[in-house]
Design a protein with these regions (language model features):
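Short glycine-rich, flexible loops that bind phosphorylated cofactors or substrates
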Residues: 333
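A generic structural motif
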Residues: 329-330
Length: 420
C-alpha cells in the first residue's frame, strides 16, 4: 500500500505490525488521531493476515484453529488479541493448499462502510500488443464469476504505451464503471496513479478488487495484487528488496538462487528437461499416460554440472516427487554434463529417487560411458537408474515407477528399482 501512496493512489489509513503489541499500539495511534479529528467519534479496525494468497477471510490458522485471516475489531486491545492469534501461525486458504502460508505480519487498517464496489485491473495483453485496462462496475467478488454471470459488465480498453492514458479515455473508462461527479474525479486520480505505477515500476499485472466508494464519498483502493517483471529486478531494487521469501515455494527459491527455471507443481514425477518447449511436451506426455508432474524444470542450454546437482537436490528434497524423468535432447546442452551431474548428485547428496533417463544428441555415448563406469561402484549404490531412449516409452516407464513407489509407500514398504 505504501508504493501506491507514492503514486497518489488513495488507500485506507494503515500500519503493518510484526507483533501483537505493535499492532495494538498502532491501533491506539489511529484512535487518538481519529478522535482528535472527528469530534470524539470512536473508530473500529480491521486486522488482515499478511500472506501472499487470496481467500484469507474464509481461511483458518492450522495451529490454533482460529477462523478467518480478516477480522473486524472494536478496540485497540481486541486488535492486539486478534494479532496474537494470527502472528507466527499458518493460514490455510483455498489458494494456499493444505500446506498454508505462515503469517509473519498483520495489516491494521481503519474500518469504513462501503457504498459500492468496483473492479479494475491493468495487464499486459498479447493480442493488444501492450497494456490493457479491464474493469467492471461489479466488484468485491471473483472476477471469473462476474464474467461468467454478467459478461456485459466487463469493460476493456487497450492503451497505446507510447501515447499513454489520455484524460479523455481515462474519464470514459471511469464512467463505464459507474463513477460520476466528484467520485469520477477521485476514481480518475486512482486509475491514473495505477497506470503510472504499472509503467514506472515494470509491473506485469495490477488487480484492484475492490475499488470502493465509501459512504462518506471517498474512492479507495481496498485490496490489490501486484506482479512485477523479474527481468526488471536490476532497476527496481526498492521493489524487489521487499520480496518475502518465506511466502514463496522453497523449491522455487532454491532454484532461483541456482539460476534455474523452475515452477513447483503438486504431482509425483519430478522432471528435469532442457528447453521450455521440450519441458512442456514432457509434462503433457506424463499427463497423457496418467501421471502428474511435480515440477517444471528447464535447465536450458548452458547449465553446468553444479546447476545439475542443484536441480537434483531440489527434486531430492521435494516430498511430493517419488521418481524423476530426466529428458535431455543434447544440442548446446551436452548429455555427458547431465550424466556427470547425476553421478555427482548420487555421491554428494545421496540422491536415491528412481531416475528414468532419456538422453539424445550431443555426447550421448560419452554420457553412457560415464554411467556405465559407476554401475558396480558401491559409492553410487543409492542411484536407482533406468535408461530408455524412446521419449514415449520413457514417460510411460516414469508413470509406472511413480505408481509402484507410491503403492509401496502406502504399504510402508521400501523398494529399490534398477535395470535388469
Amino acid at each position: 500500500m505504501k508504493i501506491m501512496k507514492d503514486f497518489n493512489i488513495t488507500t485506507p489509513k494503515f500500519a503493518v505490525a510484526a507483533t501483537a503489541k505493535e499492532a495494538e499500539e498502532e491501533a491506539k495511534a489511529f484512535q487518538a488521531h481519529e478522535v482528535a479529528n472527528a469530534g470524539g467519534e470512536p473508530v473500529d479496525f480491521v486486522v488482515k493476515a499478511q500472506v501472499l494468497a487470496g481467500g484469507r477471510g474464509l481461511g483458518f490458522f492450522r495451529e490454533n484453529g482460529y477462523q478467518g485471516g480478516v477480522q473486524v475489531c472494536e478496540s485497540p486491545r481486541e486488535v492486539g488479541i486478534v494479532a496474537d492469534k494470527m502472528l507466527g501461525k499458518t493460514l490455510v486458504t483455498k489458494q494456499t493448499g493444505k500446506e498454508g502460508k505462515k503469517c509473519n505480519k498483520v495489516l491494521v487498517t481503519e474500518r469504513f462502510f462501503i457504498r459500492k464496489e468496483k473492479y479494475v485491473a491493468i495487464l499486459m495483453d498479447r493480442s493488444a500488443g501492450g497494456p490493457i485496462l479491464i474493469g467492471s462496475a461489479r466488484g468485491g467478488t471473483s472476477i471469473e464469476d462476474i464474467a461468467h454471470k454478467y459478461p456485459e459488465s466487463i469493460h476493456k480498453m487497450p492503451i497505446d504505451i507510447n501515447k499513454g492514458l489520455s484524460e479523455e479515455r481515462l474519464r470514459e473508462f471511469a464512467g463505464l464503471l459507474g463513477f460520476s461527479g466528484d467520485r469520477l474525479d477521485a476514481a480518475c486520480q486512482c486509475i491514473r496513479g495505477l497506470y503510472e505505477l504499472f509503467v514506472n515500476k515494470d509491473c506485469t499485472q495490477i488487480e484492484v478488487n475492490p475499488l470502493v466508494e465509501t459512504h462518506d464519498g471517498r474512492v479507495l483502493v481496498c485490496d490489490a495484487k501486484l506482479n512485477f517483471d523479474d527481468n526488471a529486478a536490476f532497476r527496481q531494487k526498492d521493489v524487489f528488496a521487499q520480496r518475502d521469501y518465506s511466502q514463496e515455494d522453497p523449491r522455487e527459491v532454491a532454484a532461483d538462487a541456482a539460476d534455474l527455471n523452475y515452477i513447483g507443481l503438486d504431482g509425483s514425477i519430478g522432471c528435469m528437461v532442457n528447453g521450455a518447449g521440450l519441458a512442456m511436451a514432457t509434462m503433457d506426455i506424463i499427463h497423457l499416460h496418467g501421471g502428474s508432474p511435480a515440477n517444471f524444470l528447464d535447465v536450458g542450454g548452458g547449465a553446468d554440472q553444479h546447476q545439475i546437482i542443484e536441480a537434483l537436490k531440489i527434486i531430492q528434497q521435494d516430498k511430493r516427487a517419488n521418481c524423476v524423468l530426466v529428458n535431455i535432447f543434447g544440442g548446446i546442452m551436452r548429455c555427458d554434463v547431465i550424466a556427470k551431474g547425476l553421478v555427482a548428485a548420487a555421491k554428494e547428496v545421496g540422491f536415491d529417487k528412481p531416475v528414468v533417463l532419456r538422453l539424445e544428441g550431443t555426447n550421448k555415448e560419452a554420457a553412457k560411458e560415464v554411467l556405465k563406469a559407476i554401475r558396480t561402484d558401491p559409492a553410487y549404490a543409492s542411484l536407482q537408474l533406468l535408461q530408455e531412449d524412446d521419449f514415449d516409452k520413457a514417460a510411460r516407464l516414469a508413470v509406472k515407477v511413480a505408481s509402484v513407489v507410491d503403492a509401496a509407500a502406502k504399504a510402508d514398504l521400501k523398494v529399490h528399482i534398477s535395470a535388469p
